[in-house]
């Protein structure tokens, strides 16, 4: 039976640790590296609900995209390990139930076939290539040019968005940049690369002020990244066929829209 360490190393052969941002926290973050794994739960985040789902389904390992702990987001919480905090409660429950956690974040964003390639594929982009040297983001073209309203409807349907925010630029959609998760900082690069549209998430008000003709679409953090989970599942099944791998059904987008 495969161990947590063996699974981590196999995932790193797809999405190397070295390709993660220097502030990121990736790899095996919780549990015994020599623990044998019979069942894996794949999820975008490791929340209380996801941990309970892992307990209920008998998983020894959760493979997530977002790190269960990262000093960039959890600096104060990481100073203690208390079950009465959100992070402390998650970590305590994982350890008590001998459930390990492997997290593949910005290294999976950058990986061939990772988050951004999955997002580009889901949106039907062709001739996909890198948006930037960091490999966070992709550019591709639609088979046929579309009007913005038609493309917005496609994004909602294909990604399962509850809604989206957007700013009209040229109003036509053909050459599209994508950035799963928070990629507003790459708007100038999308413009410089001649894109007419950029699909990403977590955009600020100021991001929408100077788009210079770019159709800017905030499709949500969860919808733009959750597309990678089936690919992670397929990768694990290919390399560890003896291990049962399932995608979380309890974890959904926590952001809702009132229209």
Which residues are covered by each model-predicted region?
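Active-site catalytic microenvironments in core metabolic enzymes, especially phosphate/sugar-handling
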Residues: 1-259
